[in-house]
Amino acid sequence: MSGHSKWHNIQKTKGAADAKRSAAFTKIAKEIIVAVKQGGSGDPNNNSRLATVIAKAKAANMPNDNIKRTIDKALGSGNTDNYESVTYEGYGPCGVAVIVEALTDNRQRTAPEIRHYFDKFGKGMGAQGCVSWSFDRKGVIVIDNEEGELDEDTVMMDALDAGAEDMQADGPVFEITTDPDSFNDVVKALEEKGYSFESAEIEMVPQNYIVMTSEDDVRSMTKLLDMLDNNEDVQNVWHNWQQD
């Protein structure tokens, strides 16, 4: 995981502002609905995909009442929300690799919108697999240590004992990586030890990074990420732009 920095390299769907927070909760709620419907259960102990989304929701400070209401809604016979998972891949300025994960009820609406963003601010949308080969799918758990109250060696030992692959200190946070199949078990084990998370989800982690030196390229890349992030169907955006 050398060189991977959650805060510098991953474009997330939640922000500090109330509007961003609300949008993030809406997107997570959509993920919960899909997880319940596809997993056939509202019990995270019997639905690993739901357990993964709940971990993400809790790390994003989504209230438990919201989570429960969304699960109940998904289980209700009157729920007609039908979303499908779609992944788009393309290139930003300077050949930056970009993966877009979306949940949509209308591919004919979503695909042209995503393609337009890539065409206007990047180098175009590519075929499936054109950039995903250069990413690794990993569970990533981030623990805030801004106050310095946590001991790095202790967190490392607890993470490895829980089944994590690695842990590294990244500025004010500890970043723990896991195999995707072990993610839920690691989250549960760390929660039982009293840890809370800044974020916790399955991510696409770049194998290498691209640095931009042109201000025009930086502006275009920033705009591309903003447009993707603000699209209601887009859940996650992963890229290999090495930001300062």
Task: Enumerate the predicted regions with their spans.
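Positively charged, low-complexity, intrinsically disordered RNA-binding extensions
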Residues: V140-D244
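N-terminal cationic and glycine-rich segments that engage phosphates or anionic surfaces
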Residues: M1-G126, C130-V140, H239
